[in-house]
Swiss-Prot record:
Cross-referenced HAMAP family: GPH_hydrolase_arch
GO terms for cellular component: cytosol
Active site positions: D9 (nucleophile)
Chain segments annotated as transmembrane: none
Catalytic activity, reaction form: 2-phosphoglycolate + H2O = glycolate + phosphate
Family of the protein in this entry: Belongs to the archaeal SPP-like hydrolase family.
Enzymatic class: hydrolase
Residues the record lists as binding substrate: K154
Protein name per its UniProtKB record: Phosphoglycolate phosphatase
Length: 231
């Protein structure tokens, strides 16, 4: 099945390590768009951030935010869940670990907690979820710990975005660098891991870039365009 769209993680995939957008990735994205290949930004960040990034970067596809819990396309936002058990977990975390912190973006979020990974480790969060018998999962993105419902992930978000585009998810290639990109890999037709990605992501990739971070993201986009006959 021919790839007709590309979904891209943002942090670490089209950026420098400091999260600034990489010029080569920006050029590659605009090349893909000029060839009629829509780019979907897929991020754990807020829908507001993703919408702004899409405008500034110049992507035409839907944006998938909050690790799949929020989709925005043509000025319409769709939220796939709400938070309830997440707040139960957060209350218990604060009691036991007073120094634990959430992201400053939490007031804008509606689909999950984002906990700063320098204030607690993901295994501690997972143990507490199990102890409290909550129907939640904790995933380390490499930048933060995302806590959400099990059915909320980048894969389910991409599936919903594809409905809006009229595409089969197998017609999408996904590029990412974190553990939270695994769910995207499960639904798309072609998978690329950026060079600094964890071993488990690389093991499930069809292609691994030679370059890291945004330079690797650019390499991935050009690889897709060449492999599927766009250039």
């Amino acid at each position: 099945m021919k790839i007709k769209a590309i979904s891209l993680d943002i942090d670490g995939t089209i950026t420098y390590p400091n999260r600034m957008i990489h010029e080569e990735a920006l050029q590659a994205i605009r090349k893909a768009e000029s060839l009629g290949v829509p780019i979907m930004l897929v991020t754990g960040n807020t829908v507001q951030f993703a919408e702004a990034a899409s405008i500034l970067i110049g992507t035409s596809g839907p944006v998938v935010a909050e690790d799949g819990g929020a989709i925005s396309y043509k000025k319409k936002r769709i939220f796939l869940t709400s938070m309830d058990e997440e707040w139960i977990l957060w209350g218990e975390l604060k009691k036991r670990f007073p120094n634990v912190k959430t992201s400053h973006t939490m007031p804008d979020r509606r689909a999950g907690l984002v906990i700063m990974r320098e204030t607690i480790d993901v295994e501690t969060v997972r143990k507490l979820i199990k102890e409290l018998n909550l129907n939640l999962v904790a995933v380390d993105s490499g930048f933060a710990i995302h806590v959400k419902k099990p059915w909320i992930n980048k894969g389910s978000g991409i599936e919903k975005a594809c409905e809006l585009l009229g595409l089969n998810p197998k017609e999408v290639a996904h590029v990412g660098d974190g553990e939270n990109d695994l769910d995207a890999f499960k639904v798309v037709g072609y998978r690329i891991a950026v060079a600094q990605a964890p071993k488990i992501l690389k093991e499930n990739a069809d292609y691994i870039t030679q370059n890291e971070y945004g330079k690797g993201g650019a390499e991935a986009i050009y690889h897709i365009l060449e492999k599927f006959g766009y250039i």
